[in-house]
Amino acid sequence: MAVADPIARLVKELAKLPGIGEKTAQRLAFHILKAGPGYAGELAGAIAGVVRDVRLCSECQTLTDKDPCAVCADPRRDSRIICVVEGVPDLLAVERTHEFRGRYHVLHGALSPLDGIGPSELKIRELLLRLEREPAEEIVVATNPDVEGEATALYLTKLLKPLGVKVTRIAQGIPMGGDLEYADQVTLARALAGRREL
């Protein structure tokens, strides 16, 4: 039995979302239908609102509905320390720790020549312009510990060191609750190299 065209269209659009396959898209479509027109309207309104109201912060390039964003506008945040992250989810992860009191800069990706992502596709130019306007004392590079993240960290270091700014990299190592015997060699080596006195 074929589904009605509007349902098939909704399933097709939902399946375009990252991590959503056809079966999950189908379940979501039927959930939306079952929830009724009120829910569907609220969902459509929320999607339209995000597209209409969310933009990039002119300072840190995060997604926000206010410019500057809440972090950049907060006078209690230390503007001398900037944590550079690949994406907004990374910024949110750092914020959840409640340990970082500086500000952020979101690159919106990582260098990946094989995928056609070079420096001009990232928000690196905006970072350099920001540092011209308001010099920082330290840049914390918090890109992911993968090939693209490491390449991005190295590229940023080469750009930023000549500016006289201290460039640091987040530590990497064994996750809390992890077993040493299951750690890969690179992770274990970095954990040993990054050890600190107790």
Swiss-Prot record:
First and last residues of each zinc finger (C4-type): 57-72
GO terms for MF: DNA binding; zinc ion binding
SMART domains recorded: HhH1 (SM00278), TOPRIM (SM00493)
Keywords: DNA damage, DNA recombination, DNA repair, Metal-binding, Zinc, Zinc-finger
Listed Pfam families: RecR_C (PF21175), RecR_HhH (PF21176), RecR_ZnF (PF02132), Toprim_4 (PF13662)
Domain (Toprim) ranges: 80-175
Any GO BP: DNA repair
Classification via InterPro entries: DNA_Rcmb_RecR, Hlx-hairpin-Hlx_DNA-bd_motif, Rcmb_RecR, Rcmb_RecR_Znf, TOPRIM_dom, TOPRIM_RecR
Annotated CDD domains: TOPRIM_recR
Record keyword Zinc-finger present: yes
Function: May play a role in DNA repair. It seems to be involved in an RecBC-independent recombinational process of DNA repair. It may act with RecF and RecO.
Family that this chain belongs to: Belongs to the RecR family.
Protein name, as recorded: Recombination protein RecR
Organism in which the protein naturally occurs: Anaeromyxobacter sp. (strain Fw109-5)
Gene: recR
